[in-house]
Design a protein with these regions (language model features):
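Short, conserved "switch-loop" micro-motifs in signal-transduction and mechanochemical regulators
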Residues: 85-86
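Receiver (REC) domain active-site loop signature in two-component systems and cognate sites
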Residues: 56
Length: 125
């Protein structure tokens, strides 16, 4: 059975890129913002890994991370934050909120794949 990758990004192009790249190994579930992603998770769905954008309407990336990490069922799910912001202060904010990693857009899908799989492998021990 495929693992589930939750993609939280308001850009349809990013959702499409990630779906096409990861669909062989994951069931990819796109959500347009943190609020919709939390609603999906609160309905009893689970994710094995999450890729989330920093800047989104309704609930942005940092707010999503905080809600996710306060959820008993989802607090340990590997999460990589994507952003067009290169400032170290943005990266530090995301990591402090509970992101496991941070990548700047544009990103290399293969690198993202390796980072996700490495995190998931470490959790399986």
């Amino acid at each position: 059975m495929k693992k589930t990758l939750l993609v939280v990004d308001d850009e349809p192009t990013i959702q499409l890129i990630l779906r096409r790249y990861f669909e062989a190994d994951f069931t990819v579930v796109p959500q347009p913002n943190g609020q919709e992603a939390m609603r999906w998770l609160d309905e009893g769905n689970t994710a094995d890994a999450i890729v989330a954008d920093y800047e989104m309407p309704v609930m942005n990336g940092p707010a999503f991370i905080l809600r996710l990490r306060n959820s008993l069922m989802q607090r340990h799910v590997p999460l990589i934050m994507l952003s067009g912001k290169e400032e170290s202060s943005t990266k530090i904010q995301c990591l402090r909120h509970g992101a496991d990693d941070y990548m700047v857009k544009p990103f290399n899908p293969e690198e993202l794949d390796l980072r996700l799989k490495n995190m998931m492998r470490k959790l399986s021990f």
